[in-house]
């Protein structure tokens, strides 16, 4: 039994080590831009000259179905004067040339906890980074391979006023007898905004166009992650299809080939740590979903909607929804089926989702994620109480017969076959399951890993405080107090277990608390908190059962 337990513990240590590497990759403090002593804490300023922005290119405009992608043609530089739009949850900038969203900040989500005045930025167009939400009308529409339309607006700044629930921003453009209004509708407290096109065909010919929406991004890293050795969380595109409600399309996939599929409704998205951007077409539309790289090396995932025909002298409308914000499962599920799957819990999603649901409901009562994790740990411990009790009884009996096991070892010496037979007879006589002590580890491992992914992926944990020095449960304990406490509890629990008869095994077991403490130094404080509370509860349960066994009484 001791050999198998040692193997399981070492396996857990290896898994923990791999997760430490991944955690370092995913949860490094994002660096803020270098500031001078005179700089003021504020959102990045809008560019004031074309040289401060990345110029558009013809590949921004997708090809109409059945046509080849247009080759790059010279286009005008983006507008120097962007249109700023602010609500309580979104602060974005629209380029009048094309009407693309080229900047977007999230005022409710500081980039770093120690700088609450600097909001996290999703979309950005600069010399260092490209990440935009683009949309337009092709076919007879104003978006051509030769250039994008130059829209006009009444103002260059729009603000959701106090007491106002919605904000409408209209961009206007006219060409060839057709009047276009590109309308952005933003609502209070909503990260989803509607982008609609109103088409007034005053020409003498019927007008036929196709709506497209796409996300364009360069290969720069996730701003919420830092570079380290290990496997990064997923940074890339994803889409919905009828057969695959959540299909990842990585940058390497786009390097290899372009994707083109026909889907009914659905969505296309770009994922990063904690946040997601997604275009959601109208549910009943049949759309062409495509991925490609443009001439500047940017990665593009987008959709092209069905043909929209507006007769001469008539009016028409088409549009889609853009989401740009946190990976909030409830909000995402309301927008489109399967969009909540962008909160990627990995292969243990079937365990992680109930854990998150339970944790969320506990938090609704307590209002603190740290205490919610403690209560969740107690609930999980109670759920596995009978199984743990049986395991601890087995270990307590093993501890009680340790002198007999040592005597057998001395009796048979190096004759392992006879010693093993004698051990099995002893186990049978004492009614001991030699594998019983392994069950707590086997049971806790999936729950531990699932909780790890809950803390990793759930934006609710981002910058969530507990108490005292733990101001962010999603990052490591800044003073390593919790990992040290965890190591101490692991050492205490180890003293309640039977001593392995093999000296080498005994030395390995003594080292495990130190090894685990080292690994857990870089784990998120919330996960270490779970492990500490679980260890304390296990110690209490195991101590009680061991005392009962050693006293010769049957445990309750």
Curated annotation (Swiss-Prot):
InterPro entries for the chain: Membr_insert_YidC, Membr_insert_YidC_N, YidC/ALB3/OXA1/COX18, YidC/Oxa/ALB_C, YidC_ALB_C, YidC_periplasmic_sf
Species this chain originates from: Stutzerimonas stutzeri (strain A1501)
Low complexity: bias regions: 36-54
Keyword annotations of the record: Cell inner membrane, Cell membrane, Chaperone, Membrane, Protein transport, Transmembrane, Transmembrane helix, Transport
Protein's name according to its UniProt entry: Membrane protein insertase YidC
GO terms under biological process: protein insertion into membrane; protein transport
Gene Ontology molecular function: membrane insertase activity
Transmembrane segments: 7-27, 365-385, 435-455, 468-488, 513-533
Membrane topology of this protein: Multi-pass membrane protein
GO cellular component, as recorded: plasma membrane
Subunit structure: Interacts with the Sec translocase complex via SecD. Specifically interacts with transmembrane segments of nascent integral membrane proteins during membrane integration.
Gene3D superfamilies documented for this protein: 2.70.98.90
Primary location group: membrane
The keyword Metal-binding is annotated on this UniProt entry: no
UniProt lineage: Bacteria, Pseudomonadati, Pseudomonadota, Gammaproteobacteria, Pseudomonadales
Subcellular location: Cell inner membrane
Region: Disordered, residue numbers: 35-59, 126-152
């Amino acid at each position: 039994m001791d050999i198998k337990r040692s193997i399981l513990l070492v396996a857990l240590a290896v898994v923990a080590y791999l997760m430490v590497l991944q955690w370092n990759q995913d949860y490094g403090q994002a660096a803020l831009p270098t500031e001078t002593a005179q700089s003021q804490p504020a959102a990045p300023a809008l560019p004031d000259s074309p040289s401060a922005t990345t110029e558009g290119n013809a590949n921004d405009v997708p090809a109409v179905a059945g046509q080849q992608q247009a080759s790059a043609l010279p286009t005008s530089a983006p507008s120097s004067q962007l249109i700023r739009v602010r609500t309580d949850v979104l602060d974005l900038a629209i380029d009048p040339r094309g009407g693309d969203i080229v900047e977007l900040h999230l005022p409710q989500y500081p980039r770093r906890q120690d700088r609450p005045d600097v909001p996290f930025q999703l979309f950005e167009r600069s010399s260092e980074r490209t990440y935009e939400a683009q949309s337009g009308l092709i076919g007879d529409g104003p978006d051509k391979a030769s250039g994008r339309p130059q829209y006009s607006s009444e103002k260059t700044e729009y603000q959701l006023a106090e007491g106002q629930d919605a904000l409408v921003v209209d961009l206007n453009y006219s060409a060839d007898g057709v009047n276009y209004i590109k309308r952005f509708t933003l609502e209070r407290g909503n990260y989803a905004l509607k982008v609609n096109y109103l088409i007034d065909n005053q020409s003498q010919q019927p007008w036929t166009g196709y709506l497209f929406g796409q996300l364009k991004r360069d290969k720069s890293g996730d701003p919420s992650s830092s570079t380290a050795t290990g496997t990064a969380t997923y940074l890339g595109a994803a889409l919905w299809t009828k057969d695959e409600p959540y299909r990842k399309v990585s940058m390497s996939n786009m390097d290899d080939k372009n994707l083109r599929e026909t889907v009914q409704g659905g969505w296309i998205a770009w994922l990063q740590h904690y946040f997601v951007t997604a275009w959601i077409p109208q549910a009943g539309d049949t759309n062409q979903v495509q991925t490609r790289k443009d001439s500047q090396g940017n990665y593009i995932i987008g959709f092209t909607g069905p043909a929209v025909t507006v007769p001469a002298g008539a009016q028409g409308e088409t549009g889609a929804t853009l989401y740009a914000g946190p990976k909030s499962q409830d909000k995402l599920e309301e927008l489109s089926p399967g969009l909540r799957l962008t909160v990627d819990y990995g292969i243990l999603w079937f365990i992680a989702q109930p854990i998150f649901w339970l944790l969320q409901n506990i938090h609704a009562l307590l209002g603190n994620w740290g205490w919610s994790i403690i209560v969740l740990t107690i609930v999980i411990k109670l759920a596995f109480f009978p199984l743990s009790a049986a395991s601890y009884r087995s270990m307590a009996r093993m501890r009680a017969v340790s002198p007999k096991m040592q005597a057998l070892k001395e009796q048979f010496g190096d004759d392992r076959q006879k010693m093993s037979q004698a051990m099995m007879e002893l186990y049978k006589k004492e009614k001991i399951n030699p594998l019983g002590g392994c069950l707590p580890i086997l049971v806790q491992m999936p729950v531990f890993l699932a909780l790890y992914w809950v803390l990793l992926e759930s934006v609710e944990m981002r910058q969530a405080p507990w108490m005292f020095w733990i101001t962010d449960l999603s990052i490591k304990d800044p003073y390593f107090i919790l990992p040290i406490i965890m190591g101490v509890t692991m050492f205490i629990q180890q003293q309640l277990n039977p001593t392995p008869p093999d000296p080498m095994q005994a030395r390995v077991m003594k080292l495990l608390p130190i090894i685990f403490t080292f690994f857990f130094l870089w784990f998120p404080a919330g996960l270490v908190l779970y492990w500490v509370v679980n260890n304390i509860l296990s110690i209490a349960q195991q101590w009680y059962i061991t005392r009962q066994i050693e006293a010769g009484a049957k445990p309750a």
